[in-house]
């Protein structure tokens, strides 16, 4: 157990930006982190420090990350957690919270831990990298119809489709589809909470050490900050053990919202035909028609100028970018990405094969 600092939050936000493949919005994430440390000092706890039957809640978002209008606020995340805890009828102590996956927003979710010293930040995620569907963060439960989990979602604004609160109990896959449709109805995004999950389950099925991994990467990035794009690119690549797939001007960015997912392709003029397939996350990369990386490999696009990642929806044709890929065995992953069923929607939306390359069954 250790007390987290704002420097940890800065590092977690920077590292989370990469593990989230650019999603989350760094400035907004840092602003939320500042609020956290104005309120209190959360503590980071590893799973090894907890009892097996201790319970952990997940905090996450649902919807399209490219949504531009702010439709959710920190209070919505706190309310979702409150609703999920109230609806839980199990036994054991709820000792902490964790995020579903990393992003620049990660430290902002520590607000509840700063407000309530009895809730620790747990050094685990449902998945240690961004994922396009809640089912991928289901830690292996997406296809289980015999296990019911409480999920709550809150968000929206009154003058834009209205504000909603939803609480549901049922199989993760079914309820996740309901929340995704609800996020579309409110304009694009909701803040959500689900669980709780016992520590013994997280030790086997969660992305153990995901928070520490973000902080380590972020610390390397902060050291490279101000040293130029190549220094930042090198810090990210070397820390994660990744490789460069190519670099050059972005030839096209055909990404649009479909069924409340950001879907499409990016094409990079790297001297070869480098195509990145997008479904909220970078799901696959092809060079001259040959697959070179597939989710859950981490594919990241970095601006050549400063080495920083930005999401697919914000890339502009002509911008010079660098494409990195990090092998899946170098990333903390949850069990959910190994389920073939969770790739159904991305495969359908993209029209490409993922399961055969993803090592899922």
Task: Give the ranges of each region predicted by the language model.
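Glycine-rich oxoanion-binding loops at beta->alpha junctions
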Residues: 50-93
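A structural-propensity feature for long, helix-poor, extended segments
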Residues: 51-66, 136-182
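Oxyanion-binding "anion nests"
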Residues: 213-268
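A short, small-residue-rich loop immediately preceding and capping a beta-strand
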Residues: 92-101, 120-124
């Amino acid at each position: 157990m250790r007390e987290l600092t704002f420097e940890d939050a800065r590092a977690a936000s920077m590292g989370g930006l990469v593990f989230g493949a650019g999603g989350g919005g760094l400035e907004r994430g840092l602003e939320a982190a500042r609020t956290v440390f104005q309120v209190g000092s959360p503590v980071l706890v590893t799973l090894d420090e907890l009892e097996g039957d201790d319970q952990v809640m997940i905090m996450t978002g649902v919807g399209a990350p490219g949504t531009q209008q702010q439709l959710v606020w920190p209070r919505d995340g706190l309310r979702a957690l409150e609703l999920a805890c109230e609806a839980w009828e199990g036994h054991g102590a709820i000792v902490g919270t964790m995020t579903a996956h990393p992003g620049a927003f990660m430290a902002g979710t520590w607000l509840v831990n700063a407000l309530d010293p009895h809730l620790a930040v747990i050094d685990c995620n449902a998945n240690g990298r961004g994922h396009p569907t809640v089912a991928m963060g289901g830690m292996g439960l997406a296809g289980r119809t015999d296990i019911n989990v409480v999920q709550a979602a809150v968000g929206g604004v009154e003058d834009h489709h209205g504000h909603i609160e939803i609480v549901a109990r049922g199989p993760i896959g079914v309820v996740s589809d309901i929340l995704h449709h609800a996020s579309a109805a409110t304009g694009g995004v909701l803040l959500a909470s689900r669980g709780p999950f016992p520590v013994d389950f997280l030790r086997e099925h969660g992305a153990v050490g995901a928070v520490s991994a973000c902080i380590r990467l972020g610390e390397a990035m902060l050291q490279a900050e101000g040293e130029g794009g190549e220094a930042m690119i090198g810090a990210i690549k070397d820390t994660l053990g990744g490789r460069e797939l190519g670099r050059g001007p972005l030839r096209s960015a055909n990404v649009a919202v479909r069924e409340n997912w950001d879907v499409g392709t990016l094409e990079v003029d790297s001297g070869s035909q480098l195509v990145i397939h997008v479904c909220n996350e970078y799901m696959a990369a092809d060079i001259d028609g040959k697959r070179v990386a597939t989710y859950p490999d981490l594919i990241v696009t970095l601006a050549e100028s400063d080495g920083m990642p930005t999401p697919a929806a914000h890339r502009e044709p002509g911008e010079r970018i660098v494409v990195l890929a990090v092998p899946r065995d170098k990333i903390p992953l949850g069990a959910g990405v190994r389920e073939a069923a969770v790739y159904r929607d991305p495969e359908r939306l993209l029209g490409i094969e993922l399961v055969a390359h993803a090592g899922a069954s």
